[in-house]
């Protein structure tokens, strides 16, 4: 992004991705004094890593709804557990199944960091603030895998799953999520609530509340970029879903 400004203008704000993509301010051919304003200059910039594209064009990452589940404090010890599902704009994964073999290919690229919690994050004492902490999930989602390159993300991707352990009859193991359930999404637009029922126990996969951090691993291995999701502010969709178990 290049925005023309003059010496009299206020500094501008530019939201960019990780600065490791661009070189440091080492070029001294730019105008250094007000009287040099308007002089012709040539600047060459070399990128160390391929850029990650966002949008609907081929080779770009697409937007999607990301879900997080938090526990709501119960009124009394005998009250049923209640959870709130909070959703916001994120990046669409190419693979949606937690047990898919494609995840295993990215294990060697697992970043260092705090592992995501094994339990559903609890709300803080202030009910208006969610527990937000960067963490590394047990498995990565593949955001892109084509001729443009392979991009993965180690942020948690909350989904509902059926626990089929010990079940004697047919049990669907696929996830059930507002991000992929059109009927549920449509009902949220009108009622903001939905009751989920199943003959099998529900489990919430990939616990934790963390931002997406896309990372290119092919044709070269690049750094994580935790700021890219902020480029979707104009299309952000946020809603709450109350679930009682």
Swiss-Prot record:
The keyword Phosphoprotein does not apply. It is found in: Virion. InterPro entries: HERV-K_env, Retroviral_env_glycoprotein. Expressed in lung, placenta, testis, peripheral blood lymphocytes, and teratocarcinoma cell lines. Its main location: virion. Pfam families: HERV-K_env_2. Keywords: ERV, Transposable element, Viral envelope protein, Virion. Residues 1-245 are annotated as: Truncated surface protein. Retroviral envelope proteins mediate receptor recognition and membrane fusion during early infection. Endogenous envelope proteins may have kept, lost or modified their original function during evolution. Has a type 1 genome. The HERV-K(HML-2) family contains type 1 and type 2 genomes depending on the absence or presence of 292 nucleotides at the 5'-end of the env gene resulting in Env proteins of distinct sizes. Despite their overall retroviral envelope structure HERV-K(HML-2) type 1 envelope proteins lack a predictable signal sequence. Subgenomic RNA transcripts coding for full-length envelope proteins have been detected for both type of genomes. PANTHER family: ENDOGENOUS RETROVIRUS GROUP K MEMBER 113 ENV POLYPROTEIN-RELATED (PTHR34313:SF3). Belongs to the beta type-B retroviral envelope protein family. HERV class-II K(HML-2) env subfamily. This is Endogenous retrovirus group K member 5 Env polyprotein.
């Amino acid at each position: 992004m290049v925005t023309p400004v003059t010496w009299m203008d206020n500094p501008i704000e530019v939201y960019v991705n990780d600065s490791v993509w661009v070189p440091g301010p080492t070029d001294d051919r730019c105008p250094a004094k007000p009287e040099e304003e308007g002089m012709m200059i040539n600047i060459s910039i070399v990128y160390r890593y391929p850029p990650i594209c966002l949008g609907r064009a081929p080779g770009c990452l697409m937007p999607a709804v990301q879900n997080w589940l938090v526990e709501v404090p119960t009124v009394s010890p005998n009250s049923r557990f209640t959870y709130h599902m909070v959703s916001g704009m994120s990046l669409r994964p190419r693979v949606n199944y937690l047990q898919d073999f494609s995840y295993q290919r990215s294990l060697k690229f697992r970043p260092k960091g705090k592992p995501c919690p094994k339990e559903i994050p609890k709300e803080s004492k202030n009910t208006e603030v969610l527990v937000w902490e960067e963490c590394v999930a047990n498995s990565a989602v593949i955001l892109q895998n084509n001729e443009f390159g392979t991009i993965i993300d180690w942020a948690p991707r909350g989904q509902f799953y059926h626990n089929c352990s010990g079940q004697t009859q047919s049990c669907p193991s696929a996830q059930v999520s507002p991000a992929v359930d059109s009927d549920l999404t449509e009902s949220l637009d009108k009622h903001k609530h939905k009751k989920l029922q199943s003959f099998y126990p529900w489990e919430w996969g990939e616990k934790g509340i963390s931002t997406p951090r896309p990372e290119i691993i092919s044709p070269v291995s690049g750094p994580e970029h935790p700021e890219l999701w902020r480029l979707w502010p104009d299309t952000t969709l946020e809603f709450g879903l109350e679930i009682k178990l």
